[in-house]
């Protein structure tokens, strides 16, 4: 992880302190530890190796790879198999990952480590001889959480401010204003109906 730690330190001037602090803090406090990339599950992407039945890839190992693999598949489906390189091997390309605080480490440290670790074999196969390194995230402007009346917003518990319902009662401009002034940029915030009204 020394390369990832350096990568994070190099972004201190323009990444949010919370993103740098959480990612770099985890690396510095825990050190470089092996992480399992499989789970014993009956759902998910099965490990395609005989004898590994019942093992699936850990969602955060394979999910971030989806950014790259989806772009490669898109290029192939659209008849220009090399088109993905315009983003993934172009030093001018800038990838931004807008996420919530619970996914910071995976996008700010884990994913860059995977990209750094792909190595020459991948690049020779996909990008060609002497291919450019893969594009690392330019910024990960992660937000903290916005709660509702001091409770975690949850779709499965039907606890939230639903846009369609909101717009039947109120104009969108007050919503835009309230979300702007209460945005959880550096700390968790709370939607409070009394404050909104």
Which residues make up each language-model segment?
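Structured secondary-structure scaffolds
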Residues: 1-197
């Amino acid at each position: 992880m020394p390369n990832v730690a350096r990568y994070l330190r190099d972004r201190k001037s323009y990444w949010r302190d919370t993103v740098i602090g959480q990612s770099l803090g985890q690396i510095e406090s825990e050190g470089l530890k092996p992480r399992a990339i499989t789970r014993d599950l009956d759902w998910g992407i099965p490990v395609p190796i005989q004898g590994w039945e019942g093992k699936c890839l850990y969602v955060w190992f394979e999910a971030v790879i989806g950014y790259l693999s989806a772009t490669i598949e898109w290029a192939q489906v659209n008849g220009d198999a090399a088109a993905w390189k315009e983003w993934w091997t172009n030093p001018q390309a800038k990838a931004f990952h807008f996420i919530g605080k619970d996914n910071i480490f995976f996008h700010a440290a884990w994913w860059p480590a995977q990209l750094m670790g792909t190595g020459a074999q991948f690049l020779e196969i996909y990008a060609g001889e002497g291919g450019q390194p893969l594009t690392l995230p330019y910024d990960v402007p992660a937000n903290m959480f916005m709660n509702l009346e001091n409770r975690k917003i949850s779709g499965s518990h039907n606890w939230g401010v639903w846009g369609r319902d909101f717009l039947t009662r109120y104009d969108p401009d007050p919503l835009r204003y309230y979300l702007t002034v209460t945005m959880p940029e550096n700390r968790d915030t709370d939607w409070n109906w009394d404050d909104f009204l």
